[in-house]
Amino acid sequence: MQAVILLGAVIVVGLVAADWIAFTRKNPRVLGYGLAIGRQQEALRVSPDDFDANGYLPLPHGLAWLCPGQHAIILLPEWKRFGLRFRTAWPLNGALHYDSFSDCTELRFIKRMPWSSALLTALWFLTVAGGLIAYLVSYARAGGFASAPGAFLGVALSGLGLLVLLFGLIVVVAAYRLEDKRLMVVYDELRAVLCEKPSQKLD
């Protein structure tokens, strides 16, 4: 039984690692990979002159990568360049989709999260919530709420379960806000470059 559990844990860790590698790789396929969790639009100048021969534009806190064939710019934050130098379990990347190079083209910005982060988070909340509900149902059927001490114990344990859910929610929200702030810092840095430099090929 222990061997089966160990094998399952190794498989899960392997799948999560593979998911993160696929999510952070410098490949055009990363454009549609992950769970889309945010969208916004803005009109900006887009020119290949801002990027090097490989399509890279180094930024103070990350990298912008131009993919002309996909009409997109990938934003990859570098967590080591921020004040809090650690990566959470909910990293984000972003992709800006455009129709053509222009002095004023509409950019569609999409934020994405790894599938494993979203699925494991949902699984954790469902497990805790499901376990709490199952406990309350079985406790009530066993007559646990029939007496005052039993009712007090049931309410206390239920409150503990709710605190666990609340703590998990706080962690997820705090981590998401941190990663979103990092991504938006890189987005603002790219935006500053696009707004500052005059286009050479389009003028």
Question: Model-predicted segments: where are they?
Answer:
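Alpha-helical transmembrane spans
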Residues: 1-29, 113-185
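Membrane-interface amphipathic/juxtamembrane segments adjacent to transmembrane helices
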Residues: 24-62
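A membrane-cytosol interface segment of integral membrane proteins
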Residues: 36-50, 88-122
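Generic low-complexity segments that are intrinsically disordered, proline-rich and/or Lys/Arg-biased
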Residues: 49, 59-61, 69, 150, ...
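Non-transmembrane, membrane-adjacent beta-strand/coil modules in membrane-associated proteins
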Residues: 54-99, 113
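Juxtamembrane amphipathic/hinge helix adjacent to a transmembrane helix
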Residues: 96-108, 136-144, 196
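Cytosolic/matrix-facing juxtamembrane and C-terminal tails of multi-pass cellular membrane proteins
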Residues: 174-203
